[in-house]
């Protein structure tokens, strides 16, 4: 047992670390408050590479605000960001409580179909915040393949049949299935008869080590682990027994991987080391821009289709979530 001096030193070290985490969270939140658009949208950009190098162009989307409203819900300092993101999500909601990926700020947003991913994330975030959402459960569970997995797209051929046909000829396929999107559907709908095929498939993919073969749109195993963990931690704790050893052995390749890895460890009850994430924070309170997702990777394609999508604000959102979860674990230890 440590003596009194050692105990006081340990307490002092823990207090100092806690103060540094608090400061990093406040700086990150301040950056996000500045970056968040007047509409409440969290900005994201399109670039030719996963490193988001070269020319970048703004890409108005619903997705990042939905992610932020969920990820930052446990960060008291970010309450205003979450409220503004929820306001934005409510304005972007289409009939029946459905959403599409591009926001109405994008001139050709009607080209894109409604989708399961944005609908599940936005619905979960709004309901957790006590905001009203129409009963969209039936609309989501209809969008499943014969094997029970959720499709990416909520296909409505009318009132824009030519635009919809163009989208599915050049951009995507009506029967696209991505298990990260299934994870977000499970997170929203919970453990029920309609989601059990998706739960079983996620577990099978984890056991087989097939994470990157399970996603069309996302660019990192760390990202897959993060979204799977949000979906499965309360439903299938055995998933943590698979994810945690792999996560401990993996070396994050960039700030986004580092943030999602730290958050995922905390989701499964670990106390992550916050130091690498603290060290990666920049002087303006942000973390570096890294591509989170891309235009899709088909089975026979050696590389994902460009562009990639990411932003300093998006990485910072994940980092603030990670540090908040780390702080919570340290306080309860």
How should each PLM-predicted stretch be described?
Residues 32, 89, 140, 202, ...:
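Buried hydrophobic core positions in alpha-solenoid tandem helical repeats
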Residues 2-27, 44-84, 99-133, 151-200, ...:
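An alpha-helical repeat/solenoid feature that recognizes helix-turn-helix modules
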Residues 40:
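Extracytoplasmic
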Residues 33, 94, 203, 207, ...:
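HEAT/HEAT-like alpha-solenoid repeats
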Residues 137-145:
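Long, hydrophobic, well-ordered secondary-structure blocks that form the structural core
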Residues 86-92:
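Patatin-like phospholipase
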């Amino acid at each position: 047992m440590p003596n009194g001096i050692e105990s006081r030193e340990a307490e002092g070290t823990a207090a100092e670390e806690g103060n540094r985490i608090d400061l990093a969270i406040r700086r990150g939140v301040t950056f996000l408050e500045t970056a968040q658009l007047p509409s409440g949208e969290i900005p994201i950009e399109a670039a030719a590479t996963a490193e988001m190098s070269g020319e970048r162009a703004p890409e108005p989307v619903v997705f990042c605000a939905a992610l932020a409203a969920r990820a930052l819900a446990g960060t008291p300092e970010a309450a205003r960001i979450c409220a503004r993101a929820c306001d934005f999500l409510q304005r972007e909601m289409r009939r029946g409580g459905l959403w599409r990926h591009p926001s109405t700020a994008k001139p050709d947003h009607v080209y894109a179909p409604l989708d399961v991913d944005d609908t599940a994330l936005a619905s979960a975030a709004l309901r957790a915040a006590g905001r009203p959402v129409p009963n969209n459960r039936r609309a989501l569970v209809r969008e499943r393949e014969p094997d029970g997995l959720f499709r990416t797209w909520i296909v409505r051929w009318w009132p824009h049949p030519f635009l919809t046909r163009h989208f599915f000829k050049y951009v995507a396929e009506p029967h696209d299935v991505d298990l990260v999107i299934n994870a977000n559907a499970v997170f929203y709908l919970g453990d029920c008869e309609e989601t059990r095929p998706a739960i079983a498939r996620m577990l099978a993919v984890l056991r087989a080590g097939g994470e990157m073969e399970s996603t069309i749109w996302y660019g990192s195993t760390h990202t897959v682990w993060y979204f799977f963990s949000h979906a499965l931690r309360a439903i299938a704790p055995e998933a943590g027994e698979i994810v945690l050893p792999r996560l401990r052995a993996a070396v994050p390749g960039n700030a986004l991987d580092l943030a999602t890895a730290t958050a995922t460890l905390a989701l499964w009850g670990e106390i992550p080391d916050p130091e690498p994430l603290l060290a990666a924070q920049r002087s303006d309170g942000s973390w570096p821009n890294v591509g989170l997702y891309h235009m899709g990777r088909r089975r026979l394609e050696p590389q994902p289709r460009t562009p990639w999508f990411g932003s300093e604000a998006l990485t910072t959102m994940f980092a603030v979530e990670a540090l908040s979860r780390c702080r919570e674990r340290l306080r309860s230890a």
